[in-house]
């Protein structure tokens, strides 16, 4: 999954806390 600056994975849609 590609993690974006906002912490959201663009592909899986999982949020990184």
From Swiss-Prot:
It comes from the Eukaryota. Expressed in skin glands. Keywords: Secreted. One of its GO terms (cellular component) is extracellular region. It is found in: Secreted. May act as an antimicrobial peptide. Belongs to the Frog skin active peptide (FSAP) family. Septenin subfamily. This is Septenin 1g. It comes from Osteopilus septentrionalis.
